[in-house]
Amino acid sequence: MKKTILILACGMSFLTGFSQELPKWANKAKKAVFSVITYNKDNQILNTGNGFYIDEQGTAVSDYSLFKGADHAVIVTADGKELPVKYIMGANDIYDVVKFKTEFDKKAAVLQPALQAATPGETVYLLPYSTQKSANGQNGTIAKIDTIGNNSFYYTLNMQTTDKTVSCPIMNGNGEVLGLIQKNS
């Protein structure tokens, strides 16, 4: 009996690392995260993924690989509203990032960039895309920081992620964006 309780307790503590309560600011911030659906010229789904708004004019970011070979794309907001992607503003194949313009849903939120770089060991939060109000995110810590340009950083995290979390934002404790999750190499 004691072994069963110990195994259950260990298992429950392991699971809490994957699904945890987020800070209070996260409820509003999750409204900035959306689903991206890209289509080929025959209007068949090419790829699906995530992205998030970075301003109230409809500027957003996601992973570039979603858009490769796409004819057009739409986003689906946390409220389930489908909006067209108007145009690509810039893309970087090396870092797998794309910046694009879409309509802005007035019910959505905007994620502000972090004013300072994160520090090793700092707790960070992953905000998933969800249409559910009670969707849990997860937290982890910064394991390593690499400088990749003027005030640009590449963070290695102590966090388990999946393909469903690619292009979801990573936030600091102040609710500011540090970056977006990329595919594990």
Language model regions located:
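Active-site region of chymotrypsin-like
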Residues: 29-38, 102-109, 134-185
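Conserved active-site neighborhood of the chymotrypsin/trypsin-like protease fold
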Residues: 55-136, 150-154, 164
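Short structured motifs
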Residues: 20-21, 83-85, 140-141
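Conserved hydrophobic positions within beta-strands
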Residues: 51-53, 85-88, 142, 170
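N-terminal activation segment of mature serine protease catalytic domains
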Residues: 18-53, 59-63, 72, 97
